[in-house]
Swiss-Prot record:
<dbReference type="InterPro" id="IPR014748">
    <property type="entry name" value="Enoyl-CoA_hydra_C"/>
</dbReference>
<comment type="similarity">
    <text>Belongs to the enoyl-CoA hydratase/isomerase family.</text>
</comment>
<dbReference type="InterPro" id="IPR029045">
    <property type="entry name" value="ClpP/crotonase-like_dom_sf"/>
</dbReference>
<dbReference type="InterPro" id="IPR018376">
    <property type="entry name" value="Enoyl-CoA_hyd/isom_CS"/>
</dbReference>
<dbReference type="GO" id="GO:0008735">
    <property type="term" value="F:L-carnitine CoA-transferase activity"/>
</dbReference>
<dbReference type="InterPro" id="IPR022852">
    <property type="entry name" value="Carnitinyl_CoA_dehydratase"/>
</dbReference>
<keyword id="KW-0456">Lyase</keyword>
<dbReference type="GO" id="GO:0009437">
    <property type="term" value="P:carnitine metabolic process"/>
</dbReference>
<feature type="active site" description="Proton acceptor">
    <location>
        <position position="131"/>
    </location>
</feature>
<dbReference type="GO" id="GO:0016836">
    <property type="term" value="F:hydro-lyase activity"/>
</dbReference>
<comment type="function">
    <text>Catalyzes the reversible dehydration of L-carnitinyl-CoA to crotonobetainyl-CoA.</text>
</comment>
<dbReference type="InterPro" id="IPR001753">
    <property type="entry name" value="Enoyl-CoA_hydra/iso"/>
</dbReference>
<dbReference type="GO" id="GO:0006635">
    <property type="term" value="P:fatty acid beta-oxidation"/>
</dbReference>
<dbReference type="Pfam" id="PF00378">
    <property type="entry name" value="ECH_1"/>
</dbReference>
<comment type="pathway">
    <text>Amine and polyamine metabolism; carnitine metabolism.</text>
</comment>
<protein>
    <recommendedName>
        <fullName>Carnitinyl-CoA dehydratase</fullName>
        <ecNumber>4.2.1.149</ecNumber>
    </recommendedName>
</protein>
<feature type="active site" description="Nucleophile">
    <location>
        <position position="111"/>
    </location>
</feature>
Length: 261
């Protein structure tokens, strides 16, 4: 694909590494390439889970490439399919993505991690949205996703002052799933990915679809929507071969063999 992105398939698991000097910052060209990778992941029936990480041990990603900005790349430039970093605006991705945060996740790098379904981070990781100090706004998800995760006082401080949050604080607030040593990071992310592979793919797709559609609804309204037939994956799960295989495998005390149908 490019010198900035490396990806490896391990069976149903896709590992993507952003490796771009300096600080794994992302310009429009790199963002386009990342979007193509994530769309290919979405559309490949053999792939079940993606892991995105950064090259090196210091930066997951510093976000938007300020050198490109200084050379004329506009904040509202076309960053390609999936929005900034290829993931922040994909709203029909029904497969899980794990962000393995290996260091600083600043600005758009933090927004990329927030767009993932799970965050596993190294104990040296830290998170920040410093855009206001640069005269811009974290509009690739930071200003939208962070308020769903944190109390207003913390959100305001992070958005308006750019203050950093370390890995342990992020764990306490529930922003990240796991904090591990730098050396154990990828093993931990791969372990989580394998746990996800062990779950039925249609069920995972339905869960993501339901959550995406109903997360802002009152519970009663959410129930009505689920039963309305408007969803794509949920009805398919109910009448799938996997819905038969799961209980049957449990009764027979064996691992299920998922077919994704």
């Amino acid at each position: 694909m490019s010198e900035s992105l490396h990806f490896t398939r391990h069976g149903p698991i896709l590992e993507i590494t952003l490796d771009r000097p300096k600080a794994n910052a992302i310009d429009a060209k790199t963002s386009f390439e990342m979007g193509e990778v994530f769309l290919n992941f979405r559309d490949d029936p053999e792939l079940r889970v993606a892991i995105i990480t950064g090259g090196g041990e210091k930066f997951f990603s510093a976000g938007w490439d300020l050198k490109a900005a200084a050379e004329g790349e506009a904040p509202d430039a076309d960053f390609g399919p999936g929005g900034f970093a290829g993931l922040t605006e994909i709203f029909d991705l029904d497969k899980p993505v794990i962000a393995a945060v290996n260091g600083y996740a600043f600005g758009g790098g933090f927004e990329l991690a927030l767009a993932a379904d799970f965050i596993v981070c190294a104990d040296n990781a830290s998170f920040a949205l410093p855009e206001a100090k640069l005269g811009i706004v974290p509009d690739s998800g930071g200003v939208l996703r962070l308020p769903k995760l944190l109390p207003p006082a913390i959100v305001n401080e992070m958005l308006m002052t750019g203050r950093r949050m370390d890995a342990e604080e992020a764990l306490r607030w529930g922003i990240v799933n796991r904090v591990v040593s730098q050396q154990a990071l990828m093993d931990s992310a791969r372990e989580l990915a394998q746990q996800l592979v062990n779950s039925a793919p249609l069920a995972i797709a339905a869960l993501k679809e339901i959550y995406r559609a109903t997360s802002e609804m009152p519970v009663e309204e959410g129930y009505r929507y689920i039963r309305s037939g408007a969803l794509k994956h949920y009805p398919s799960v109910l009448h799938s071969e996997d819905a038969i295989e799961g209980p049957q495998a449990f009764a027979e005390k064996r691992d299920p063999v998922w077919k994704g149908r």
